[in-house]
């Protein structure tokens, strides 16, 4: 018999991580998680402790869903994060978890729900569509071999690269300002608080190592790139992979080779740390046409994911 119950904080963290890790066995771009990784996530400003549910089949935990409400966002739009262990997919568990999440979001005053789906997971996509979700966005996970990093491909040589200094509050404040200014026209944008930027730079559980660099032109910081190494992912997948977690240039300085310069510096940083592969994710409809830049420096699309949305 299938039952769905609420997550109990302080009790269910090991269960949550066990199911989440098992559900990612067939995913190439996600690794397993551990309790020590979940706890830092809960320290993220705006983290939603409510809305988490676990599906149990004959007493065995087989799926989970988080009807995630961003407490810092005023758009009344919730995000459904759903995971089911592969051998239990397609048995009706996803539908019951989705319906539970939709009811939870509605009760909590949300007016719309979003959900993500791997483009290869046709069964889940069809379920979303049957429940009234509409496709609203596409994204790409891209990879490149760091042996193929090139130079002289249009990078701006007049731009200086300066590392962020973790003990300088001014640097953290500048990343916060740049991030909000650069991404303000993007899908699902809301301004990050300074506390969120600190979390992103220094506390994110995904990266044991992270480095961030400013692009400086005529004494002004006009963009940045942030790269990181997820050691657990690399060990589990038996790869030496680093990630470009964020890169951006202020609007008035785009199309001048500055993004290319930042990308190449980030890739060389990962390569110098012994990485052999770089990974990033991009919104296919990014208004800055970032996908074109990434292809220019050598990235190729490995997989697609879709964002779906419906009114409540």
Predicted regions: what is each one?
Residues 140-166, 276-279, 283-291, 297-312:
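C-terminal "cap" of GNAT-fold acetyltransferases
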Residues 77, 105-118, 270-282:
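Conserved GNAT acetyl-CoA-binding A-motif
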Residues 90-103, 246-249, 255-268, 272, ...:
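Conserved acetyl-CoA-binding loop-helix of GNAT-fold acetyltransferases
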Residues 20-57, 61-68, 189-217, 222-226, ...:
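Active-site rim helix/loop that mediates acceptor-substrate recognition in acyltransferases
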Residues 1-39, 154-192:
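Short amphipathic alpha-helix that is part of the acyltransferase structural core
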Residues 54, 80-90, 247-254, 284:
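A short, internal acetyl-CoA/4′-phosphopantetheine-binding micro-motif in the GNAT/acyltransferase core
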Residues 60, 71-73, 85-159, 306-310:
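Acyl-donor-binding surface of acyltransferase catalytic domains
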Residues 69-80, 89, 209, 231-244, ...:
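A conserved beta-turn-beta hairpin within the catalytic core of GNAT-like acetyltransferases
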């Amino acid at each position: 018999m299938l039952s769905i119950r609420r997550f109990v904080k302080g009790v269910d963290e090991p269960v949550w991580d066990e199911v989440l890790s098992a559900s990612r066995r067939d995913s190439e771009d996600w690794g397993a998680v551990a309790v020590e990784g979940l706890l830092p996530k809960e320290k993220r400003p705006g983290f939603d402790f409510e809305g988490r549910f676990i599906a149990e089949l004959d007493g065995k935990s087989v799926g989970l869903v988080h009807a995630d409400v961003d407490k810092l966002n005023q758009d009344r739009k919730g995000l459904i994060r759903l995971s089911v262990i592969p051998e239990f997919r397609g048995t009706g568990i996803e539908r019951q978890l989705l319906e539970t999440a939709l009811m939870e979001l509605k009760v909590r005053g949300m007016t719309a729900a979003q959900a993500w789906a791997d483009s290869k997971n046709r069964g889940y996509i069809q379920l979303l569509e049957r429940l009234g979700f509409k496709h609203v966005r596409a994204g790409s996970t891209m990879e490149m071999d760091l042996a193929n990093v090139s130079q002289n491909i249009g990078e701006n040589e007049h731009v200086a690269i300066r590392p962020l200094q973790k003990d300088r509050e001014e640097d953290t404040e500048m990343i916060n300002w740049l991030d909000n200014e650069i991404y303000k026209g993007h899908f699902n944008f809301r301004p990050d608080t300074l506390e969120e930027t600190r979390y992103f730079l220094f506390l994110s559980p995904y990266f044991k190592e992270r480095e961030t660099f400013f692009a400086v032109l005529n004494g002004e910081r006009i963009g940045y790139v942030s790269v990181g190494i997820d050691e657990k992912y690399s060990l589990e997948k038996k790869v030496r992979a680093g990630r470009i977690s964020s890169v951006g240039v202020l609007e008035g300085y785009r199309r001048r080779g500055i993004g290319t310069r930042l990308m190449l510096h980030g890739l060389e940083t990962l390569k110098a740390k012994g990485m052999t592969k770089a990974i990033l994710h991009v919104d296919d409809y990014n208004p800055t046409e970032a996908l074109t830049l990434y292809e220019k420096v050598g990235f190729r699309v490995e997989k697609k994911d879709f964002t779906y949305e419906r009114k409540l």
